């Protein structure tokens, strides 16, 4: 049984734009799967459909053999709890401390009223501190999040996802706004999490060299259709030219020197 399974998935937006077309795709446990393609190819739509930030129009998406497409109420909450999310623009509460932001990854485990009052048990604080240590910013735990650099803020968001104790992490262009050195640090963090904790990573990346360096698997989308799915070792320049529908530009190839 695949960890994530797309079955004949289609997404059509209200304006008629086709986001995804007839997607059949399996993601296996422990994959570091990188989604590539032009802007507007459907990368974010595919990624965000996994935890239903975007609902699909038809088809089904299964997580561990169970339909998240059909899940409702508490069942949906329990399934989402198992899926961490990292965004391009961090999505942090800027005036809150680093620790408080990471603790927000635990909200799915407790009643809403406790979370509003900030009543996190000691075990949650231990998990949050462990997550911060794993991404090497434990020493910043009591600082305001908006006092830190972009790279450090992205590491907070990774720690928040880790504190959630997910089986899957979705990362939507997590390094798009970062400089090359910070990009490498963040990508190294994600790869380490994947290899050491066995957490499946499904990530959108703009730069082809990053996809090849870090991905075990490349998923290519063009105009909402799946045009390549295979090991990174098989993703040749010709394959990428086909995914993009043209030769790659220099600023699409190189992310980290």
Curated annotation (Swiss-Prot):
Listed EC numbers: 7.3.2.2
**Broadest EC class?**
translocase
Q: Name one GO molecular function term.
A: ATP hydrolysis activity
Matching InterPro entries, A to Z?
Answer: AAA+_ATPase, ABC_transporter-like_ATP-bd, ABC_transporter-like_CS, ABC_transpr_PhnC, MetN_ABC_transporter-like, P-loop_NTPase
Chief site of localization: membrane
In terms of SMART domains, this protein maps to: AAA
- Where in the cell is the protein located? Cell membrane
UniProt xrefs under Gene3D superfamilies: P-loop containing nucleotide triphosphate hydrolases (3.40.50.300)
- A GO CC term assigned to this protein in UniProt: plasma membrane
Q: How does it sit in the membrane?
A: Peripheral membrane protein
List each copy of the ABC transporter domain by range: 4-248
Reaction catalysis annotation: phosphonate(out) + ATP + H2O = phosphonate(in) + ADP + phosphate + H(+)
Assigned keywords, A-Z = ATP-binding, Cell membrane, Membrane, Nucleotide-binding, Phosphonate transport, Translocase, Transport
Entry binding sites for ATP: 37-44
Q: Mind telling me which CDD domains this protein's record contains?
A: ABC_PhnC_transporter
Q: Does the keyword Cytoplasm apply?
A: no
Subunit organization? The complex is composed of two ATP-binding proteins (PhnC), two transmembrane proteins (PhnE) and a solute-binding protein (PhnD).
Q: Which family does it belong to?
A: Belongs to the ABC transporter superfamily. Phosphonates importer (TC 3.A.1.9.1) family.
Q: Which PANTHER family match?
A: AMINO ACID IMPORT ATP-BINDING PROTEIN, PHOSPHONATES IMPORT ATP-BINDING PROTEIN PHNC
Question: What is the role of this chain?
Answer: Part of the ABC transporter complex PhnCDE involved in phosphonates import. Responsible for energy coupling to the transport system.
- What is this protein identified as? Phosphonates import ATP-binding protein PhnC
Q: Which organism is it from?
A: Staphylococcus haemolyticus (strain JCSC1435)
């Amino acid at each position: 049984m695949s960890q994530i399974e797309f079955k004949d998935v289609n997404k059509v937006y209200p304006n008629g734009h086709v986001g995804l077309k007839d997607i059949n795709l399996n993601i296996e446990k422990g994959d570091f799967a990188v989604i590539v393609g032009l802007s507007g190819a459907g990368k974010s739509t595919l990624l965000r459909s996994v935890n239903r930030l975007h609902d699909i129009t038809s088809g089904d998406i299964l997580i561990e053999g169970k339909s998240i497409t059909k899940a409702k109420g508490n069942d949906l909450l329990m399934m989402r709890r198992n899926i961490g999310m990292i965004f391009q623009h961090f999505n942090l509460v800027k005036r809150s401390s680093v620790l408080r932001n990471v603790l927000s990854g635990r909200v799915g485990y407790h009643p809403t009223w406790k979370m509003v009052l900030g009543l996190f048990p000691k075990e949650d604080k231990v998990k949050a501190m462990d997550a911060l240590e794993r991404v090497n910013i434990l020493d910043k735990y009591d600082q305001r999040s908006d006092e830190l650099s972009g790279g450090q803020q992205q590491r907070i968001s990774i720690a928040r996802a880790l504190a959630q104790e997910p089986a899957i992490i979705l990362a939507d262009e997590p390094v798009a706004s970062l400089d090359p050195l910070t990009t490498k640090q963040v990508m190294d963090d994600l790869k380490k999490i994947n290899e050491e904790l066995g957490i499946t990573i499904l990530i959108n990346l703009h730069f082809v060299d990053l996809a090849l360096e870090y991905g075990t698997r490349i998923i290519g989308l063009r105009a909402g259709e799946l045009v390549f799915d295979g090991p990174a070792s098989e993703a040749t320049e010709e394959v990428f030219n086909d995914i993009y529908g043209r030769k790659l530009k220099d600023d699409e190839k190189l992310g980290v020197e």
